[in-house]
């Protein structure tokens, strides 16, 4: 059967105060919501002056292998950190994500899990790049079973192995969930609220563009006179569908609303529209009168 979580929380002074929810402590697939941890790590690097928004990243064959949804660039082309971050959030660009992880280093993402309040950073250590996770989940050879039963050390070896071979998607598994084998990025509804709150706190000084990056695509139609700011990140992989919003109402009260759904087989396309209707109803319930 399906597993799911849902949470509505107020954010006060950077802390999440749950108002309603189900299974809010359960670790479930994040799909592309994991990219919020990459953005949080990037914001920290920008604050500490180790990375600048204007730094250029060079497109590699490996980063292109995971697909791009907005940066149709050839190998060797260069893209700024700022543009990569914008695309990673707005169009969930996988190539941009891996270029940023490569620039920051996976250690920085693992540290970001901790500083953003993830309940179990060890569960995402070693932190897989998209190339690595796609290789484990959907590539040849099939490494899913190996991954499922592997210790942290063995998982690190598996990730090294995927990096030494070209990613070849296995068409027979293209639509089968890898989350059944633990090949996903994981977090709870509580974690999702905390990383949204962390990103809001990040968005000051040199890292202030984070606020605009998060809100470029609201991902939901709400009355903007009631909800003047809507930051959003959603995700979808076979069997996994996730939504999250950091929205500020007209009184200035921030809210985080999230949904995570997980099925043992691929879900159809209709469920997305249905979930967005549910989300709109939730926002209607919490909107100031």
Which residues make up each language-model segment?
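Acidic-enriched, low-complexity/disordered segments with a strong bias for Aspartate over Glutamate
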Residues: 12, 17, 54-55, 93, ...
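Charged, low-complexity, helix/coiled-coil-prone segments
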Residues: 25-33, 41-58, 131-142, 153-158, ...
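Low-complexity, flexible helical/coil segments
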Residues: 41-47, 95, 124-126, 135-137, ...
